[in-house]
Curated annotation (Swiss-Prot):
Pathway: Amino-acid biosynthesis; L-histidine biosynthesis; L-histidine from 5-phospho-alpha-D-ribose 1-diphosphate: step 5/9. Belongs to the HisA/HisF family. Keywords: Amino-acid biosynthesis, Cytoplasm, Histidine biosynthesis, Lyase. It comes from the Bacteria. This is Imidazole glycerol phosphate synthase subunit HisF. Its main location: cytoplasm. It is found in: Cytoplasm. GO terms for cellular component: cytoplasm. PANTHER family: IMIDAZOLE GLYCEROL PHOSPHATE SYNTHASE HISHF, IMIDAZOLE GLYCEROL PHOSPHATE SYNTHASE SUBUNIT HISF/H IGP SYNTHASE SUBUNIT HISF/H. NCBIfam families: hisF (TIGR00735). Heterodimer of HisH and HisF. The gene is hisF.
Length: 251
C-alpha cells in the first residue's frame, strides 16, 4: 500500500508567503523557499505553491521563485495559479516544478487536461476542485470559490480522470478554515469512484483530522496550511503520531 503523504500548501503573493507565519529564527518569515526547506527538513512528502497574484509581473516573480525552490528543495513540489495554457505549464516545469495544479482553467476548458497529459504525462497534471456542499450535493466553484458552476464534484472528478488527470486535489469550501476535520464522506466517495490518488484539503485543525482523512476518507494525501505555518502542528510529530496510529507514512 502506498505511503500516505503530508503536503503543506503555501499561498504566494508577489514572491512572499501570505498566510501569517511565526517560525522563530526566520530572517524573513514570508520567504517561501526558506519555509519550504524547513518543511522538507521536518519530513513533508511534497509541497504545493499557489500563485495568488493575477498580474503579469506576479507571474514572472513566481517563475523566478519556482527556480529558487527547485534549487533548494529536494522533495517534489506542485505549482498552481494562473495556468491557462500549455506554455504556462512548460514555463513552470522548465523552472523546476514537478507537477502543475489547474482549477478554474480546467473547468472552463476541460481539453486542457488532455493537452497537459498528452504533452507532459498524466503524473504532471493535478486537477484542483473547490466544491461547496449545498442542496445535498457538492457544487464546484471557479475563481477561488467565488463563482458557482454547473458542475458537481463527483462527475467532474470522474471526467477529469478520464481526460488524463493524475491526481485530484479536493478542497471542501464547507470545511476550509474551520479546523473541524476534512470532508471525509465526500473524500471516501471520491476514492471509491476514481482510480487516481485524491488529495484532501480544507479542515485540518489537529493530528486526529489527518488520521481520520486517511482511514475514513481514504485520501492518498492530506494538504494543510495554517496548522503548519503557525506552528500548531510539527510535521515530524504528526508523522510519528500517524505511524503510532497504524497509518503507513514515511518517517
Amino acid at each position: 500500500m502506498l505511503a500516505k503523504r503530508i503536503v503543506p500548501c503555501l499561498d504566494i503573493k508577489d514572491g512572499k508567503t501570505v498566510k501569517g507565519i511565526n517560525f522563530v529564527n526566520f530572517r524573513d518569515a514570508g520567504d517561501p523557499v526558506e519555509l519550504g526547506a524547513q518543511y522538507s527538513r521536518e519530513g513533508a512528502d511534497e509541497l504545493v505553491y499557489l500563485d495568488i497574484t493575477a498580474s503579469h509581473e506576479g507571474r514572472k516573480t513566481f517563475t523566478e521563485l519556482v527556480k529558487q525552490v527547485a534549487a533548494h528543495i529536494s522533495i517534489p513540489f506542485t505549482v498552481g495559479g494562473g495556468i491557462n495554457e500549455l506554455k504556462d505549464v512548460d514555463r513552470l516545469l522548465s523552472a523546476g516544478a514537478d507537477k502543475v495544479s489547474i482549477n478554474s482553467a480546467a473547468l472552463r476548458n476541460p481539453a486542457l487536461i488532455e493537452e497537459i497529459a498528452k504533452n507532459f504525462g498524466s503524473q504532471v497534471c493535478v486537477v484542483a476542485i473547490d466544491a461547496n456542499f449545498e442542496n445535498n450535493d457538492w457544487l464546484c466553484y471557479l475563481n477561488g470559490g467565488r463563482v458557482p458552476t454547473d458542475k458537481y464534484l463527483f462527475q467532474w472528478a470522474s471526467e477529469a480522470e478520464s481526460r488524463g488527470a493524475g491526481e485530484i486535489l479536493f478542497t471542501s469550501m464547507t470545511h476550509d478554515g474551520v479546523k473541524d476535520g476534512y470532508a471525509n464522506d465526500a473524500l471516501a466517495t471520491l476514492a471509491d469512484t476514481l482510480h487516481i490518488p485524491v488529495i484532501a484539503s480544507g479542515g485540518a485543525g489537529k493530528m486526529e483530522h489527518f488520521r481520520d482523512t486517511f482511514s475514513n476518507g481514504k485520501a492518498g494525501a492530506a494538504l494543510a496550511a495554517s496548522v503548519f505555518h503557525f506552528g500548531e502542528i510539527r510535521i515530524s510529530d504528526l508523522k510519528q503520531y500517524l505511524k503510532d496510529e497504524g497509518i503507513n507514512v514515511r518517517i
